[in-house]
């Protein structure tokens, strides 16, 4: 250990930030008023509201953590395996600055590259300044300070200290997945799986006797998008798991019904649909069968592929009316924009880009058929912030089936969460929204992400109190609803 460095024993037990005097390092300090309004009076109100929600259990109704973590409760590997590898927010920024994904250990289509985790972590630490002002630094600094008890900032000179301290912690029972789940005060956590998943991990969680509530979400994209590169292989698996002839229109729809029932038997309450657009359609049965025949034959145009996806959203709505699953629609991402990177590394490598998205016309066929149905609930998200006040808030402020999902992906920053409230509340109110989704693969960041959302909402509510638009007791009740009650209600948890 070099002079001035803290030992692991000194690093881990005490979570209170302290001044660290080594001239080569800087203290890591989380200010208790972070993210609250700058005005002292409004900040005091926000602080009081936050005290009402800070310790509430976490409801995580949509995300992408690995259910196998909780099924088998094996130790996490190292800092890279746990904090860097699952987080495409991090490697998209690093890639933008010329860092190769191979240097970070990101899997290619041929498998994991040969790399040294410590060197990857050193590289990340030396570029950590890139994340200043981003939500990633807010989340990670809270993880470093509150989960691992680290007391100095991550930078080149502290890279090894971090890597060793995190590695030592991950070898202890307190940092196993289930122990962290309980430490984080998570009441329910939803993962996301496709219809071709065997759900073995979720079955193992149920069989283990562990009391943590981890449920799946039904995401049928691989068997609904004929332009997905794995579509034909996915259909083979879909047929095997459902026992249906998925190459006939009736058998295909029945396979969805049966797989949804299998998910529901393990606690699933929601579906998710990550389509390029929000387009929906309401074809006659004859038209739908004719279109499906083209899709299965592989003889379709891009417009017909889009029409099929649109029809399938309406078919999913019909199934949700029957089985009660809440629909989530996450449209508007131009996926795999970097063709060369997609060819070498595959999907979900930080190369997805937001694009303009229409909702008023796109959703109308589905809403014409089901928009007033008492059993249907559809939660709509956007990457196109221009639609908040023009389209989404008015739609959710009218149709009983619609709710607004929170600021998503590129916009779940402090500023993005504020913009969402500022642009939707006047028309949709608070109670046509659904609280917060962390929507992450980065398990350790979940408490930090929810904490940021709670702080931002308390700051927004505090301003309404300061402007005498809400009383403080109304604001406190609303803060609790946004943090806890609304996500439970919206997702039927």
How should each PLM-predicted stretch be described?
Residues 25-323, 372-386, 393-493:
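Metal-cofactor-binding active-site regions of metalloenzymes
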């Amino acid at each position: 250990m070099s002079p001035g460095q803290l030992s692991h024993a000194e690093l881990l037990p005490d979570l209170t930030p302290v001044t660290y005097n080594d001239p080569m390092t800087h203290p890591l300090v989380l200010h208790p008023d972070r993210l609250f309004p700058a005005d002292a009076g409004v900040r005091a109100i926000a602080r009081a509201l936050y005290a009402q929600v800070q310790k509430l259990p976490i409801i995580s109704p949509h995300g992408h953590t690995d259910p196998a973590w909780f099924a088998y409760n094996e130790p996490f590997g190292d800092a890279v395996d746990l904090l860097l590898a699952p987080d495409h927010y991090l490697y998209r920024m690093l890639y933008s600055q010329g860092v190769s994904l191979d240097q970070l250990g990101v899997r290619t289509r041929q498998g994991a590259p040969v790399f040294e985790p410590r060197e990857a972590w050193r590289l990340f630490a030396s570029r950590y300044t890139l994340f200043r002002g981003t939500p990633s630094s807010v989340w990670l600094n809270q993880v470093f300070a509150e989960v691992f008890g680290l007391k100095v900032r991550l930078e080149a000179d502290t890279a090894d200290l971090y890597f060793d301290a995190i590695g030592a912690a991950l070898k202890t029972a307190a940092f196993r997945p289930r122990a962290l789940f309980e430490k984080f005060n998570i009441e329910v956590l939803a993962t996301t799986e496709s219809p071709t998943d065997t759900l073995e991990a979720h079955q193992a969680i149920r069989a283990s006797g562990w009391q943590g509530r981890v449920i799946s979400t039904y995401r049928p994209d691989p068997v609904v998008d004929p332009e997905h590169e794995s579509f034909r292989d996915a259909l083979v698996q879909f047929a095997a798991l459902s026992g249906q002839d998925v190459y006939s229109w009736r058998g295909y729809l029945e396979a969805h019904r049966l797989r949804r029932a299998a998910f529901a038997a393990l606690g699933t309450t929601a579906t998710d649909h990550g389509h390029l657009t929000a387009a929906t359609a309401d074809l006659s049965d004859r038209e739908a069968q004719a279109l499906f025949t083209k899709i299965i034959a592989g003889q379709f145009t891009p417009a017909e592929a889009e029409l099929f996806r649109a029809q399938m959203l309406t078919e999913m709505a019909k199934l949700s009316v029957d089985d009660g699953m809440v629909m989530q629609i996450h449209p508007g991402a131009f996926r795999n924009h970097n063709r060369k990177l997609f060819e070498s590394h595959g999907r979900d490598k930080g190369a997805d880009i937001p694009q303009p998205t229409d909702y008023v016309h796109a959703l109308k066929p589905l809403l014409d058929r089901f928009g007033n149905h008492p059993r249907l609930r559809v939660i709509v998200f956007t990457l196109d912030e221009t639609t908040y006040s023009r389209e989404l808030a008015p739609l959710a402020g009218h149709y009983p089936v619609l709710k607004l999902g929170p600021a998503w992906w590129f916009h779940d920053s402090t500023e993005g969460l504020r913009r969402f409230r500022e642009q939707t509340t006047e028309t949709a109110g608070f109670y046509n929204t659904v609280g917060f989704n962390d929507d992450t693969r980065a398990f350790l960041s979940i408490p930090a992400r929810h904490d940021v959302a709670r702080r931002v909402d308390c700051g927004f509510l505090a301003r309404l109190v300061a402007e005498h638009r809400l009383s403080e007791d109304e604001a406190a009740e609303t803060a609790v609803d946004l943090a806890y009650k609304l996500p439970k209600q919206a997702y039927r948890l």
